[in-house]
Structures are given as C-alpha cells and as structure tokens.
C-alpha cells in the first residue's frame, strides 16, 4: 500500500503520463488487477475516449474511469447497500419543508423564513455542505454553544441561532432518512464503510487526476483506498513537492499545495508508505514558445516581457457580447476551414455562463458549429412541466384565465389523435370568448351552458339569436367540455384527497387520462423525423422526471395531510429544479466549458470569453445561509466548511492560470465593451497584464459587420451560408445608401443566388432592401370589398383622413382588437350617452321639465338609468366585482352631476332639445347625406347625433349641435380643415339640410358645442363667501366648447346671464357691457358656417373617391405632436417604419381659426 504524487505545472504531461502508464499495464496484462482512473464527473467521457482509442490495446476490462459518485455506485453494487430508496434533491427538500412545518415552534430563526422563496433550497445546500465536510448535528450544537457563551464579537448570537436551527433540521432529516433512504451526499459515506469489503478494489491501482482539492468526505474515501489498494497515484498541478513549508496564500499554487500537505499527513497518520514524488518539469503541451512563456511567467513579479512576434496569443475587443461571439465563431470556422483544425480541438471557456449561454446557442446555430455545453438545461419550458404547473394553478386559483390557457397552450389537453391546427384555432376562439366574458371560477365548472351573442346593443334587449350565433355557441360549449373536463376531474380528485399519496395519485391519473406518454411519444417521433435529436430525447426524460417527482413526494410526504395550495407550492418547487440529463458529446464538437468547473484534455485552441472587470478576477459573492463574516468566525473555531469568498479570491488566479495554459497551439482572450443593454463594461486587469507580457501583440477590434471592423479582411466574414447571408445583406444595405463595398460581396451574392437551397432565402432577404411597405388595392377589389353603395359613418371618414391604411384594416379587412372583459373609455362613453338619452325619455314620458328638475330628481333619474344600462355593458362587467360595483356608484354620481348641470343650463337658456340620439341614414330619424362619386359609386353618410337644440330668434329658427364627451374636447378648425374632425359640421349640415323634416321649417346654424360629462372637484384659492360664488364655481367646469354664430341675440338665447361683461358659464362667449361680442369669443359668421359645411362636403366626396379607387397607403398624419399612430390598434399590421423607403408621416401645418375661415371663404368666392 503506497501513496505516490505525480506533480507538475499545467502542460507538463501528468494526465498523459497516467494514461500511458495505464495503457502499458493493459497491454502487458489485459486481465490483471483492477485499475481505477478517478476523475471529476465532467472529465470522465474524455478520459474514457482517450483510453478506448489506444493503439495496440485489445480491450480495457481491468481499467475503468470513475467519478467519486460512480465509484460509490460500483462498490455498493458489489458489497450491498443499494437496497435503500434513492432520494433526489427535490425529495430531500420536501422532507426539509415538512420538518420545518412540524418543528416551527422550536426554531429560533428559520421559522419565520421558511415560506420565503429559495429558503428551503439554501438550507438543503447548507446541510449538504455539512455532510460533505463531515459536520454532525451534535458538532453544530457544540459550536453554537461556544458562540453563544462568547461575548464582545458582533453577530455571534445570530450565528449561534443559525447553527442551532440547522442542527435541529439536519438531525431530524437524518432520523427520517435512516435505514430507508439515501440522498446524494450519503453515497461517499457508504463508500467509506464498504471499501474494506470490496474485492473489486483489493490490490487495485488507483489514479486520481483532475482534482485540485477534496472535501473531507473525499479525503475519507482516499484514506480507505490507501488501506485497500496497492497504490494510489494522485496528480496535482503544482510546481514542486511541499513536504516542508507552505507557500504564501497569494502564491499561485497555494490550493494544490494545501491538498498535497493534507494527503501527505493523511498517509503518515495511517502508516502508508509515501513514494518519492514524481515531478514533471518539462512543458510538453505548448508547441509555441509564447504559450510556454505565458504558462511560466503568469503571476510572476516582475513580469518578463516576450519581445518576439507571435500569433499564438490573440486579444479581441468587441463592441458588445454578440459581436464578440460572432467574431469567435468566424475564427472557429477559419481554423477548421483553413488550418485543418477539428471542432474537438477547440474549447470555449466562460465564467459568466448566464450572460453567454443563449448567445452561444444562437450564434453557433447560425454558423453551423457543433458544440457541447457542459451544463444541464432546466426543464422549465417543456410542455409537460408547464401543463402540471398550470393545471395545479388552475385549481388553486379557481380557474383564473391565465392559468387555464397556459395549460391549453401546451397542446397536451387536445385529443391524442385530433387535428392539431384545428384544435389550436378552436382554443384561440375559446380564449377570445373567455377574455370577452370574464369567464372564471364557477363559470368553468358549472353545468350552465355558455351563451353567445355577437352584438348586444344598449337598446336592443330582445334581438333574436341568429343561426350563425347558435352554431358557434354549440361549438363553443363542445370545445369547453373537451378542454375543461380533464381539469374538472383533476380538481374533484384533488379536493377529495386525504393525504399526499391521494394528491399525487390525482395528478398522475390526470396525466394518464390525457394519454401524456403517447402524446410525448408522438412529439418525440416528430422531432426525430425533423432531425431535432436532442429534443426527441428530452420528451421521454420529462415524463420520467415528473413521475419520479411524484414518487419522491409519496415516499417523503405520502402519509401527510396537506392543504392543496401547499401541495401545489411544493410540486412547483420540485418542477423548477428538474433538469435534462447532459447529452454525451459527439466525437467532433466544440466544448463550451465553465472556467471554474470544467476539466479539459487535449485542447489545441482555447477561447476565453467575457474577460471583463468583475468577472476576472471574480467578485466575492456573499450567498447562502452563512455569510462570509460568519464563515470566518467558524474558521476561528476550527470548523471546516467549503471555501468562502476570501479563499475563492485567493484561488482565482490558479483557475485563470489553468485556463490560460489550456491550449497547445493558440490562445484567444476576448472581452466586450458593452452588455446587451448598451451599458459600458471595462476590460479585466488580466488584459493589461497580457499586453505587458506580450508587447508585440495588439488588440484586435471586432465589430458586428465589416463596416464596424475595417481591420478585418472581407473574406473573414464569408463563413457558412446562413451567417454570410446576414453580412451580405448588411453590405447591400450600405451599397443602397451609396456607400462603397468590396467587390467580394457581389461574388458572394452570385454564389448564394446560384445555390438551390439558399436562393429563395437570399431573394427574400434582398427584397427587404427594396421593400417600401406600401401596396395598391385595385379598383375592382375595392368594389368587391365595399360594394357599389358605401354606407359610412363620419368617424370612418375621419379615420381615412388620419391614415388610409388604418381605414382599410378596419373596414376593408375588418380587423379588430380582442374584446376584453374590462371597462374601458369607449364603454364609459356609451354608458353616458345611453343614460342621458334614457333620462331625456323619462323626462318626456313623465311630463317633467328640464328647467324644473330638482337635485334629488336628477339623482333618482340618473341612478335608474345607470342601473338599467349597466347589465348591457361588457357582459355585465359592472356587476362582476366589488371594485366594479364601486365604479358603478361613481358613474351614477357623474351622470347625476351632469343631469343637474343640464337642468341649470336649461334654466338659463332659450334653447330646448328637439332630439336626443337622433339617427340619420336609411330607416333613421333623418335621411342620410348622399354623394355621387366620380366612378358612379353612391356613398351615404349614416350615424347618430347626441343632441339637437332649437330656439326661436328674430331671424328665424336656430339649431345647434351638442356632442357629449367623456373627456375634455375642443373644436380645432385645423383638424376640421384637414378632415380629422368632421363630426360636428356634418351633424350641423344634416339638421340644417333636413330642418323642415325635423322642426317643420328651414333653420339657421346657431353653433356646435362639446359638453364634457364629468364630476370635477371644485378648487378655489380662497373661501367662497356666498351661494352665487359656489354656484358659479360648480358650473365653470361644464362650460361647453365649440363654435357659435357671431350674433349677440343667439348668444343671449344660449345664456341669458351673459350681460355685464362676464364670460358665459354655459358657452365659450362673452358680451361686452355695450352688448357687443367680445373678441375672445369663439364665434363665426353665418357665411363662415356655410363655407365650413361646403368644405366638409367636398372632403367627403374626395375621401369616398379615394376609397372607391382602392387607396390603402400607409400615410399617417402628424400635426404638431399628435400622430395617427399614437393610439392606433393596427401598428403591428402595417409595420410603419420611417426608416423604410416610402414610409413617412403626412406632416400637416397648423392653421389659426382666422386663416382657415379666410382660406375657405376665398374658395367659396372662387366656386
């Protein structure tokens, strides 16, 4: 029995020496004593591959490559001990959660933290660390007692309480697992116990390689191996034996020196012979002198510069991380294509895997680079995991929309042999219905049939259901039953379950009834047929993982009664920790490795990426239950735990050294100057160190495309078709903007366009350069869309003027937004309009007078109107919750306040309403306005006028238009001029054109006014002394805005209290003390009103002609800071982009009121 050290710096050939010695023994005696090559988990495949591909070796029966856990599994298989149930981390955490719940009252600190996210995982990691470092619960209690008795040092009591709580949970966990279960940390303890009984290891030769330090458990295993085996050879990356004297903590080899000393002391304590250390002093790896110089001089002070030219060390500075990875990918392609490298010769070494993981996957896919990432992928996004999570959330949250449709969108609720496309469309329609009707809770689970009505007008209570609506309703209920029935059965079983076993059984039956194994098998077969082999294997893994999770729960908590919400929380925590098994690397792949974790063999080209400040050297992270300061306190007590932040800071140069010394031919060190959000990043101090060490090596700037990297030759961007196409399009875009490009890119274009596989892709990409995002609708298609007679509302005409494409999307394609079950501004506006109409009807029916309405009558009429209308708004949304009931009360107050103000207006006004919600169009109260368009198409304007008032004056009958608005609105003649606001003058034109039909005689225009329906808070700078001031303050916010006839008599008719030079509280006008109209009044002459009416008519004819001609241009207006795109629902459809040729705003010039009236007046004179 002996211990032998094989020492040497990185690249000295330690691994090669071990492998050659093993090969030699295999060749001499293939069936001799056991040879075990013990390496870290991530190194096992490479070592097995190296052994298998040994020339002259007929087999390797006697030699096997193991990691510590796999060696434990092999020995326990031989000696017994595998009969206990293996509990994964998820199962252990379930047990910890149960212990905390049961012993909460005894816990000093953790009882309050138990429900916090991630706490159980942290506690489990702490207990696992205690096991690895052979700390028992009793020892933890003893150390807690020492800390508690000590004084004068801050935080000792807190740490004592932590240790006490950890000890309590740890002890209870061990008691629960004892004799029945094994967790991941128990295998090495069992291995220690069973090595003495293992005939497999008796007299074996053990080679331990790839480790730099060991945990106490691993030291105990090595101790037993020293007793049982013939020889244990330990390879360490160290410059010399450390039999006498330890290096300084800042020494590069401090970590392996510690390991050397501990192993030596272990052998001496057990009377094991220590052979003379074998020190390999020659650098066998580095074929280039510069790399050898780097390995030798790194971390030496002072630095000895390497003055010769070299291409073995390359420094890349990139604009951002994507540019960095693309530059690396281009260089990998060049190495393989031009220098004969194999992908397996290349390694990507990363410390910040979370920042680069997805980027590497995306870029390497674009460049067709095969790679193996030494990192397990979480199962979060697998459909089965999402189904289980969403199904439990559906039950716990009582069928919330989001949870239900997360389950539906996994596709796993659909029938196993159903048409997937058909069921997805059905699910979309079902989702639209649920969103529009606010379906949740009992609406899903009751037997009550869902009803469907496409339209539900506020005054159309008895409209019969159409055959089309009835057919859709039948389909809707059929889809609902098919998708909701499995979830309903799951809910019933879960709520009947008496314990954890019952809950897991309910969930398993749910998955079985849905035939999940068969569906996943189909998905796997499809993925395999499409060449997605990794995905094909993942489907089976996901099913096994979920079933195993349920098994673990039953084993750990099966007999425990548990609230459903707590069960769902535990299962979700378990699902979050599920990971796909690592797929073994293929023969020829780039290895993507983590700087601190991976062990690499036979790498010729290494790329160390993301070398920024804060990454190398690494920042100390104070994570876990025990803080860095507390670890220091424990270390003072002699407690051995995993290296804390301080030690890791000392060890960091060693791991950087290993990465730098890894390649045998060329080293690339890269760093970005900005992250994905554009925030600046600083290069690591390592970059400065390398520049000082190699002064002849310059930093190479990498850009996103050839224009960003003038140093690079254009041909370096020509790699594989997919990636090259991206650069080609970038160059052609520059050429289109009259920039010069290298002739090489035309050759690239010709090659790609001549290739059958890439021709269509290139043509599609190139077409985008000349894409104008505009289209013309032929006149015949316009006729088919809109018909020979166009019936249009005024708002439709306005929409066309704002943007012709928005009109086409809305009225041609008939696109509309999803209807969502919530109260929105248009719904409030509808309610206000309908309420005022119904109040006016009740005033007329009950023979009341607007002028005589009291405040209480206004409140009564308003409350009754809102109560009648509310059930017809958005599927009774105002009755769906306490919040909406409160909003309904607020709306009643608004309507009551408005009604009272209207009553006050009536008292002061000579105008009286002659119509509310007056319709015009075929079958309406008034005929439509008709226009003959230039192609013979007839256009009719239809709509509804909120209110028309009439008054008698010395000149004759006066008519005015009042439009109710739920938000403040002013009449801007600029918008009228450009056709953006046509309603008011169209309504005025309608009532004046058909005045004889409406009031029995011709009429004159009195004005157009907006009335703001609201319930404002009265603000005053000082105390209001009398009722008159209060009344004035109450009426001021309700002053109507608009345009009035410039006639003093008309203004007095609108407000009899406008004398004495005061502003009217009703209309936007003021009379001076002499009775003249004040210049600030918003007025226009009768001829001006006529000119505005004629202008609006001309606009309608022009708009109608353009619609008939098929104008669908994407031409949104821009007026000051307002644009048509601001609130447009069709932005995702039109894809308006000012950067595209032909896309731009129609910029409208603001006009003053006088300028508009003058322009229109001149036009009238000319006509």
Swiss-Prot record:
GO biological process: double-strand break repair via homologous recombination
Superkingdom of source: Bacteria
Residues holding ATP: 8-15
Domain UvrD-like helicase ATP-binding, chain residue ranges per copy: 1-359
Cofactor binding annotation: Binds 1 [4Fe-4S] cluster.
All residue ranges annotated as the UvrD-like helicase C-terminal domain in the record: 282-588
Pfam families linked to this entry: ADDB_N (PF21445), PDDEXK_1 (PF12705)
Keyword Transcription regulation appears in the UniProt entry: no
Binding site for [4Fe-4S] cluster: 803, 1125, 1128, 1134
UniProtKB keywords: 4Fe-4S, ATP-binding, DNA damage, DNA repair, DNA-binding, Exonuclease, Helicase, Hydrolase, Iron, Iron-sulfur, Metal-binding, Nuclease, Nucleotide-binding
Function per UniProt: The heterodimer acts as both an ATP-dependent DNA helicase and an ATP-dependent, dual-direction single-stranded exonuclease. Recognizes the chi site generating a DNA molecule suitable for the initiation of homologous recombination. The AddB subunit has 5' -> 3' nuclease activity but not helicase activity.
HAMAP family: AddB_type1
Family: Belongs to the helicase family. AddB/RexB type 1 subfamily.
Quaternary structure note: Heterodimer of AddA and AddB.
Name the record gives this protein: ATP-dependent helicase/deoxyribonuclease subunit B
